């Protein structure tokens, strides 16, 4: 049969076609035996595999305590440590030996300044544990939201993150992207199920989804036009939550890229960028704004004595956001 066409609203292929899943009931890696008859036992095996790898040198623990001494609450301390992680490490994929399953030692990540998702998440956990802040290492899939609850297998995960559990507050941390704000649950894991790796207490949990009312894409623009159809437009694009995540790259683009982007979105092929700036507000909710002024020689269409003024400059941009509706 012919391959199905890509459609934003279709369910994942694995959910609609027949599949056969195979997995060993008993396995052994690096001398550690595991059982795949339950997610709890998978978590127990991962806990044993990671045993002793979340230790830091005494001098590093003392440095952490000195760094966070000024912050009165565990949340503020955790945020300061997350900033430290962002500023002193970088993501490098390491899959040698059993590196695809077991993270590097936290002390090695501290010394080298890099690691993969497992290593960076484990390192972050190690730093928080050194400050007596409760946290857990977790594995998750960035491709599938749901795990097979009656078929436990490590192959269902491809990523590692971590969870901070405070009284009345649960914080999920992505440790591989230094641009993401503290506690931001990005689109690759939002609403996905994860395995909390905590020995006998290992279990499946689901990460929260952003609230619909906080996901906004807003355009504001003020236009001045002349009798010959030329127009100046001051435009403000505001994005929050998933839209914020998708549009953060706007802060890195050049004037020429900005001009090309605006021409594509508005359909104004002759638009020229007069000025532009990118602004972020991460204090209360994750919001970014892109503010610019354009000049378009053919802003309005003319026909004899009539002038046709576009009332929605961004109508051509709607289809790009179907996955976020």
Residue ranges: model-predicted function:
Residues 1-325:
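A sensor for short, sequence-defined functional sites
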């Amino acid at each position: 049969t012919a391959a199905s066409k890509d459609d934003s609203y279709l369910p994942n292929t694995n959910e609609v076609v027949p599949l056969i899943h195979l997995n060993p009931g008993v396995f052994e890696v690096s001398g550690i035996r595991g059982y795949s008859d339950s997610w709890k036992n998978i978590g127990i095996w991962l806990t044993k595999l990671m045993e002793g790898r979340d230790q830091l040198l005494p001098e590093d623990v003392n440095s952490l305590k000195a760094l966070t001494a000024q912050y009165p609450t565990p949340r503020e301390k955790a945020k300061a440590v997350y900033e430290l992680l962002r500023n002193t490490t970088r993501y490098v994929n390491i899959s040698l030996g059993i590196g695809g399953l077991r993270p590097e030692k936290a002390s090695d990540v501290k010394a080298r300044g890099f690691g993969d998702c497992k290593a960076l998440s484990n390192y972050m956990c190690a730093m928080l544990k050194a400050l007596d802040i409760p946290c857990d290492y977790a594995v998750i899939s960035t491709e599938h939201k749901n795990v097979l609850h009656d078929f436990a297998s490590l192959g269902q995960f491809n990523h590692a993150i971590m969870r901070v559990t405070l009284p009345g507050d649960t914080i999920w941390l992505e440790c591989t992207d230094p641009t993401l704000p503290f506690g931001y649950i990005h689109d690759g894991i939002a609403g996905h199920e994860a395995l909390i790796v905590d020995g006998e207490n290992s279990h499946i949990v689901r990460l929260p989804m952003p609230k619909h009312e906080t996901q906004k894409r807003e355009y504001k623009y003020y236009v001045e036009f002349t009798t010959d159809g030329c127009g100046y437009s001051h435009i403000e694009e505001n994005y929050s939550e998933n839209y914020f995540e998708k549009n953060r790259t706007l802060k890195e683009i050049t004037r020429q890229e900005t001009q090309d982007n605006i021409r594509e979105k508005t359909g104004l092929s002759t638009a020229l960028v007069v000025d532009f700036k990118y602004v972020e507000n991460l204090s209360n909710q994750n919001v970014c704004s892109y503010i610019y002024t354009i000049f378009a020689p053919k802003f309005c269409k003319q026909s004899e004595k009539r002038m046709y003024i576009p009332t929605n400059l961004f109508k051509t941009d709607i289809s790009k956001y179907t996955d976020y509706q």
